[in-house]
Amino acid sequence: MTRYKAIISYDGHDFSGFQRQPHARTVQEEIEKTLVRLNSGQPVTVHGAGRTDAGVHAYGQVIHFDLAGSRDVEKLRFALDTQTSEDIDVVSVEQVADDFHCRYAKHSKTYEFLVDIGRPKNPMMRHYATFYPYDLDLSLIEEAIQDLVGTHDFTGFTASGTSVEDKVRTITVASMEYDQQRQFLIFTFSGNGFLYKQVRNMVGTLLKIGNGRMPVGQIKRILAEKDRGLAGPTAAGNGLYLKEIIYED
């Protein structure tokens, strides 16, 4: 068997997430269906580096899978890209070592989150940016977001009931940019890993700080007390994008 690594992008609107689940359309299942056709009807299991939720998009999701024999990687990429549904794009395919695992190999991830703060909102972007209808002081967000950078226990920013025991993660980039032309906020977070719904919970908290309903020092308190109840609401998944995954050599 030969192992292949692929970078894919997808529009998450019509998917119930990346991971295969019964009675639901998922990214994993769509790609596996194509690979079965390319593998003479034999089953193929696709592994993903990130398990994006329903409605979440990706520019740079990484997957791996095994096929019998060696294939021309560009022909394989073309076949996967053209025979998989139009809301999935196969950006690249390469052959990798048999022990490579896209999820467990050491890597960093970058997420983007788009917030529509236009008045009126842009209805064409309703599936691709989260609309925020309330006033915001962007200087408060810019001040508070810096408290997320560094190595912290992010228990207060993960979904309750998560089975992950070690909730310490390192965030290397936490920034917000205002796109004045589109009237969008673009949040960017890079780090060595993110907990379940962590990015969406951080954005929900930052928006509440920007609206003046939480103090600017609230993030420091959440990190110190590890209390999800101190954080803001979970932002909707439609604004979230898995932008890039970089593996260490």
Swiss-Prot record:
Catalytically driven reaction(s): uridine(38/39/40) in tRNA = pseudouridine(38/39/40) in tRNA
EC code(s) of this entry: 5.4.99.12
Keyword Cytoplasm: no
GO MF entry, a single one: tRNA pseudouridine(38-40) synthase activity
InterPro entries in the record: PsdUridine_synth_cat_dom_sf, PsdUridine_synth_TruA, PsdUridine_synth_TruA_a/b_dom, PsdUridine_synth_TruA_C, TruA/RsuA/RluB/E/F_N
CDD domains the UniProt entry points to: PseudoU_synth_EcTruA (cd02570)
Enzyme class, first EC level, given as a word: isomerase
Keywords tagged on the record: Isomerase, tRNA processing
tRNA processing in keyword set: yes
Parts forming coiled coils: none
Binding residues annotated for substrate, in chain numbering: 111
One GO biological process term: tRNA pseudouridine synthesis
Active site per database record: 53
Family of this protein: Belongs to the tRNA pseudouridine synthase TruA family.
Quaternary state and interactors: Homodimer.
Role summary: Formation of pseudouridine at positions 38, 39 and 40 in the anticodon stem and loop of transfer RNAs.
Protein name: tRNA pseudouridine synthase A
Origin species: Streptococcus suis (strain 98HAH33)
